[in-house]
Amino acid sequence: MLGGIKMNVLTMSECCKRKLDETYLVVYAIKNEINIKKGDYIEKSDIYTLVGVDIKGYRQLINVYQDKVNNSRYWLECFESLKARGLKSILFLSVDDNKNMKRTAKIAFPGVVFTDSITDIAPKFYKYTSEKDSKKLAGKLHDLYTQKTATDFKTSFDNFKKEYNNVIHQKLIEKYLSNTEGLYKYSVNIRQLLFKHSANIYLYDRIRISFNENKNYVKDLNEIYEKLGSIDDYFGFKSFKKREWTLILNDLIQLYPNIDFI
């Protein structure tokens, strides 16, 4: 309330139409599988929630999209719509193996670098891990990406493989974690930015729990916006303490000297 005038509060769907910043350091593409009703049929569909971190370290919900695997131009249209909202560059895109998204992201933002998505990898391990151990597993996966040095990573990775040593886990490790060491060309501070997963896991779980894949369905994306809750959970907060952010920014300036971060 301002001077007796009641102020309108933006809804989640309205926030996803606002003007964007020119640059996002990282955009997390968080995938959930939900049921969507089309006519008389209910089919499973992948939903991607895009969350960006701006150059000041603030997280912003960008939008929610329903993947269209048979439309090779769909993601290009999505990225072009983001550019129309003011977005000019994405430094890192944390995404699963969605080939259409990666291909078209490179067209829209030629300098983008793709990184693993922990919110995609962790649930693949959850399927074959007891419920009480899933949180511990998520922490260990995060640790694989955020060791101080490549030598520390190798030690951590060896221990991870020893602990998760059944045939299924070994197959998952080979398929999804075999290239993790390559990310150690980036400093630990930048990797903390790329794989700061706690807030992303919260969003992933919020959609997963709200739309149980065996019990619920939606008719359109507006129902997802409604379930996401308050905009305060997705806008205007930092995921990093001041010292953490200073170290991240210091390393980004060295990696991207032509970008004005400050």
What is the predicted role of each segment?
Residues 79-80, 204, 208:
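Amphipathic, well-packed alpha-helical segments that form the structural scaffold of globular domains
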Residues 7, 84, 99-103, 107, ...:
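Short alpha-helical patches at protein termini and domain edges
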Residues 54, 68-74, 146-153, 217-221:
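Intrinsic-disorder/low-complexity, polar/charged segments
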Residues 30, 90-100, 120:
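Acidic/histidine-rich, metal-coordinating catalytic segments
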Residues 35-37, 100-104, 124-128:
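Switch/connector loops and helix/strand junctions flanking conserved nucleotide-binding motifs
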Residues 106-203, 210-215, 227-228, 233-236:
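Extended amphipathic alpha-helical interaction segments
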Residues 207-262:
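Basic, amphipathic alpha-helical segments enriched in Lys/Arg and hydrophobic/aromatic residues
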Residues 2-92, 199-200:
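RNase H-like nuclease fold core
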